[in-house]
């Protein structure tokens, strides 16, 4: 292992080895141990006591973070011509249908979220092999296939995010930026945890939340006590 830099030593000095932090404490410490010169992402990793190979234990959902994500979310609205004005007024960055289907076929996926009206899904379905692996395929369960495209766009712009468990039983998501106040980070983290608890499958027995870690881009992870979601 190479010699630690001054910043690395400072960061490690602020972390108590073996300690499990409350959400409130972790939200303060994460700002103290982040030394990047850019506005780093604040992330959460939650290991669940489920078997993601079983369909009735597949965790997926949406959550509207009270303080948003602190970054611009690029939204593509795939709609018919009569709906384009509503989508644009709601804040969609890209609006259309056939031209964007062709662009995506040719490899363009420079967006964060794609929202589609149900009436166009017959044409959008052919993009599944391209959009699916990137987590961009519109889906009714995540609210990205919607009759009210205008509302769906506004919700995404205001901080609504889609999450799902990976093959290892872990849910990973961004909950904000390091420029947020500790209170904003804590609020977003608790809202995400509360949503995870709501979508617990009825068939799951035993420990549901196995571990929770809070980190930022290039920072060490802080272990968080999941029970502190109801308090400090």
UniProtKB/Swiss-Prot annotation:
PROSITE patterns: RIBOSOMAL_L1. GO terms for cellular component: large ribosomal subunit. Gene3D superfamilies: 3.30.190.20, 3.40.50.790. Binds directly to 23S rRNA. The L1 stalk is quite mobile in the ribosome, and is involved in E site tRNA release. Protein L1 is also a translational repressor protein, it controls the translation of the L11 operon by binding to its mRNA. Part of the 50S ribosomal subunit. Belongs to the universal ribosomal protein uL1 family. This is Large ribosomal subunit protein uL1. It comes from Azobacteroides pseudotrichonymphae genomovar. CFP2.
């Amino acid at each position: 292992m190479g010699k630690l830099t001054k910043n690395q030593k400072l960061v490690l000095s602020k972390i108590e080895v073996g300690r499990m932090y409350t959400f409130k404490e972790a939200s303060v410490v994460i700002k103290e141990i982040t030394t990047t010169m850019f506005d780093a992402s604040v992330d959460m990793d939650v290991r669940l006591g489920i078997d993601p190979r079983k369909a009735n234990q597949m965790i997926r959902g949406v959550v509207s973070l009270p303080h948003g994500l602190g970054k611009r979310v690029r939204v593509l609205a795939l709609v018919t011509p009569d709906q384009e004005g509503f989508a644009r007024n709601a804040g969609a960055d890209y609006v259309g249908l056939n031209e964007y289907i062709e662009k995506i076929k040719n490899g363009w996926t420079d967006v964060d979220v794609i929202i589609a009206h149900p009436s166009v899904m017959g044409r959008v379905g052919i993009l599944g092999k391209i959009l699916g692996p990137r987590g961009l395929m519109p889906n009714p369960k995540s609210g990205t296939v919607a009759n009210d495209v205008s509302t769906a766009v506004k919700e995404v712009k205001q901080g609504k995010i889609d999450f799902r468990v990976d093959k290892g039983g872990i849910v990973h998501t961004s909950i904000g930026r390091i420029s947020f106040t500790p209170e904003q980070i804590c609020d977003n983290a608790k809202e995400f945890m509360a949503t995870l608890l709501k979508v617990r499958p009825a068939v799951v027995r035993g420990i549901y939340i196995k571990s929770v870690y809070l980190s930022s881009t290039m920072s060490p992870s802080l272990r968080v006590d999941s029970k502190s979601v109801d308090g400090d």
